[in-house]
Amino acid sequence: MTTPPSPAQGSADHATRARSFDAAAAQYAAHRPSYPAALLDAVEDLTGRPLAGARVADVGAGTGISTALLHARGARVLAVEPGDGMAAQFRSSHPGIPLVRGNGNALPLADDSTDLLTYAQSWHWTDPHRSVPEALRVLRPGGALALWWNRDASDIEWIAEASRRAGRFFGIDIPAGKQRAARTELADPTGRLRFTRREVRWSRRIPVDSHLANIGSHSFLLVCPEDRRTAFLAQERDQLLKVFPDGIVEETYDVLLLVAGKP
């Protein structure tokens, strides 16, 4: 269940959900999925330049899942993270990678300073009417903005059924959210950017309790009452063990990648 929430910018609910990760930073770092090497290959292909040596700012870096991958590719990467708990977890896990505090709506970066601006699982927390102009300000001529999200592969039956269960339990329309997240025009309602889209499928096998901890690190669960969250995760555990009796869950993701060059 990795679909981004509706970007109700300025709403109390949106702000509460955005802040909810700080208290669960260790859980997030331990159980959230990473990204496949093929995704970074696609970033290089669509931007037309190697990551090695590029000046990259990874915004909404969280605990550093994507930042570490960019660093390993040889990018000169700087993490930008607004949350206290997430930033503390990042610094604990990646002491050799620089981090500054800030967010995409007001980047703490100089004009024309960055070859590549990345948002892994984080663009939907920004207000694109502010974050698009900020991206264009800090990108160098010829630079690019890359956005990506792990999204559940909903054509796989057990994943589709899990989404339906979550929708029924919480009264949310998950399929509508997935359709909304796939609309590239919502990434930039200002119309200043021209995105190229690519999808990369990948999977991982993890213990059922790790899968449940991954689900539990999503904002819609972090902000709900503890008794309701516990009841939902217990129900999910029972259902998952019917599909995966050995207790090992195969998660499958379609990474949605959007890349736009600076006009």
Predicted regions and their residues:
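Conserved Class I S-adenosyl-L-methionine
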Residues: 3, 183-263
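A short SAM/SAH-binding and catalytic strip from SAM-dependent methyltransferases
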Residues: 115-129
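Conserved catalytic/acceptor-binding region of the Class I
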Residues: 130-205
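A short acidic, Gly/Pro-enriched loop at the edge of an enzyme's catalytic core
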Residues: 105-117
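A structural alpha-helix within SAM-dependent methyltransferase catalytic domains
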Residues: 44, 68-71, 132, 136
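Class I SAM-dependent methyltransferase SAM/SAH-binding core
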Residues: 55-57, 62-106
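Conserved class I S-adenosyl-L-methionine
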Residues: 1-52, 86
